[in-house]
A protein has these predicted regions:
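Structured soluble/peripheral alpha/beta segments that form catalytic or ligand/cofactor-binding pockets
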Residues: 258-589
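N-terminal catalytic or cofactor-binding beta/alpha core of small enzyme domains
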Residues: 1-257
């Protein structure tokens, strides 16, 4: 077949992206997403991020245990996703046949094969998620939907349980199917189960027949960003995996004392979509935003609470366009007026609100790279011991910190309010260590996207310090898809909050990767003379996120010094617009 045949059939003939390693252990490693994004992937509504560093990790892991390996080191998953059966059959059927031959050879030599699929999980906290078609429910592992469990009870309670214990001893939590259970019919892991015994594809039938005899143990290993970037967590993770799978005499381990009960009968109810919370349900993201003008540092942290919550995160905008980021997934732990997820903690201390973090952060030298997440992650490095200690002291007329949170039926629901105040603290990240003093806001996340009905929106908050008048202000404007305009402004002074009208915000950028050229706002009170707020951008980060109906949300988010007459302060700004990707114009519905 020629290149013309490749274009006509869609089957990839070039195999330069594939690296094959021959080993003597009864183990086959596969890294399906080790490539890099092609430029055209940026035009997609929701481009997939390749699993950076998994090619190198798989290569190192194979050397450590003497395993065979099939490594994708260059092919963009947005071109062909080797982890999706339909795309494999359409564009690389030979790759499926190659895996079947490799498994057959291992089984013929050793009597059984262990298949480990090496993937990347784009959460930064050092974590590993084990996919075998199940999720954990207490002491049970239950199939997701109609998934087949891809490993035996003995393998789950032996090598996999030992892997979990070895990782835990190295401060790396391991979970079963928390994020990626690998139970979908199109998932490559399911090719190594008896799910495809009746398939019309010979390679799938062969793999399923081998699995039906109990001769395949298959596992999907999802490594977080901190476990993939060069550094201590990656070294400790590979060390634990080598210890667990390196004994090739039997390829397993004696069971651990506390065993999991594995349910193998598919529960179709788990395949049904989860019920969404009602539209009237309170927003579920609470956090804090702070700006220290003298240090030129901004910080944003938030926690997801209640139904649909997925995690927590903290981002630091540092001088010279640098960014430090930590993210985590899972359920926020709530104890009174204290929220925590891993090393990130947000709590009430007396009348103050405190944020504390000690852990790894990915630091990126150029904030504009965050327009393409894969580009940002590929340029970043791991700071294994970043520290953040911040305290927000609310202004006298603001609500008591405890009022920001209320507990109801075991869930923590954020009250729809906020508290502005003065900031004090210290950070250490990306070689920078400094004390912080400035301004902050806590409460419902200021920049949450919500239902994304807007075509554009401009928002900001600013503080001016105690003794000033006003103490703080908050301005929001947006244009909806029906071209209706909405605006609100409220100002905090010694008597409390007041609503203003006649609101206008000027906040424009030359391009999605450039900071705002002009930042200002005007507002009036009962038709009186206008107040004008002028901002000078200190730092910013551009973001690109998928929106509804083939649109994409482009956001410029950052911190600025603000002046209001003779008063000086600082705060946060955001400009977002929703573009139709087909026309590159503001979306209309």
């Amino acid at each position: 077949m020629s290149s013309d045949d490749e274009a006509r059939t869609g089957v990839i003939l070039d195999r330069s992206w594939l690296e094959e390693i021959d080993g003597r252990a009864p183990i086959l490693l596969v890294a399906p997403h080790g490539g890099r994004a092609e430029p055209k992937a940026r035009r997609l509504v929701n481009p997939k991020v390749n699993d950076l560093h998994t090619a190198e990790i798989t290569r190192e892991f194979a050397r450590g245990i003497g395993a065979s390996a099939l490594i994708n080191s260059a092919l963009d998953r947005n071109r062909v996703d080797l982890n999706r059966m339909s795309q494999l059959l359409a564009h690389a059927p030979w790759f499926l046949e190659l895996m079947a031959r490799r498994v057959r050879a291992i089984v013929e030599r050793h009597g059984r094969a262990v298949v480990l699929l090496i993937h990347g999980w784009n959460v930064i906290a050092p974590r590993l998620d084990v996919g075998i078609g199940v999720r954990r429910h207490g002491g049970e592992l239950r199939p997701v939907g109609s998934a087949r469990v891809s490993a035996s009870d003995e393998f789950i309670n032996g090598p996999l349980a030992h892997l979990g214990r070895r990782l835990a001893a190295r401060d790396i939590p391991a979970t079963f199917g928390l994020r990626y259970p690998a139970g979908g019919a199109q998932n490559l892991l399911q090719a190594f189960t008896d799910r495809h015994l009746e398939s019309g594809v010979s390679a799938l039938r062969e793999l399923s027949a081998i699995a039906a005899r109990g001769a395949i143990e298959a596992v999907q290993l999802e490594l977080s960003v901190a476990l993939r970037m060069p550094g201590g967590p990656r070294e400790r993770c590979i060390e634990a995996m080598v210890e667990c799978f390196g004994d090739t005499r039997r390829g397993d381990s004696p069971p651990v004392p506390a065993q999991l009960r594995i349910i193998r009968t598919p529960d179709i109810r788990s395949a049904l979509p989860a019920k969404r919370p009602p539209a009237a349900a309170p927003a579920g993201r609470v956090g804090i935003e702070c700006f220290a003008p003298d240090a030129r540092v901004g910080a944003m942290a938030s926690f997801d609470l209640g139904a649909g919550g997925v995690g927590a995160r903290i981002m630091l905008l540092l001088p010279e366009g640098r960014v430090a980021l930590f993210t985590n997934e899972g359920r926020t732990r709530l104890v009174g007026a204290r929220a925590s997820l891993g090393p990130l903690v947000f709590e009430v201390r007396g009348r103050r609100l405190a944020l504390r973090f000690r852990g790894p952060m990915v630091t990126v030298p150029d904030a504009t790279s965050y327009l393409v997440l894969e580009r940002a992650l590929s340029s970043g490095r791991l700071d294994e011991s970043a520290e953040v200690e911040l305290e927000l002291d609310p202004y006298p007329k603001e609500a008591e910190p405890q009022a920001l949170f209320r507990e109801h039926a075991g869930q923590w629901d954020p009250v729809p309010t906020s508290a502005f105040g003065t900031l004090a603290g210290e950070i250490r990240a990306d070689g920078l260590r400094c004390a912080l003093g400035g301004f902050g806001r806590a409460g419902l996340s200021f920049t949450g996207l919500g239902p994304m009905r807007f075509t554009s929106r401009r928002m900001l908050w600013a503080c001016f310090g105690e003794g000033a008048s006003p103490l703080a202000l908050e301005i929001r404007t947006h244009i909806d898809a029906d071209a209706s305009e909405h605006a609100s402004a409220r100002v905090l002074n010694s008597a409390g909050w007041s609503a203003f009208d006649g609101v206008r915000v000027e906040l424009e950028t030359r391009s999605v990767s450039a900071p705002p050229e002009h930042l200002s706002a005007t507002f009036t009170e009962n038709g009186a003379s206008a107040h004008t707020l002028i901002g000078e951008v200190e730092n910013f980060v551009p973001l690109s996120r998928p929106g509804p109906a083939n649109t994409r949300i482009f956001t410029s988010l950052g911190f600025a010094r603000f002046t209001l007459g003779s008063r000086e302060g600082g705060g946060l700004f955001e400009y977002s617009r929703r573009d139709d990707l087909a026309t590159q114009a503001p979306a209309r519905t």
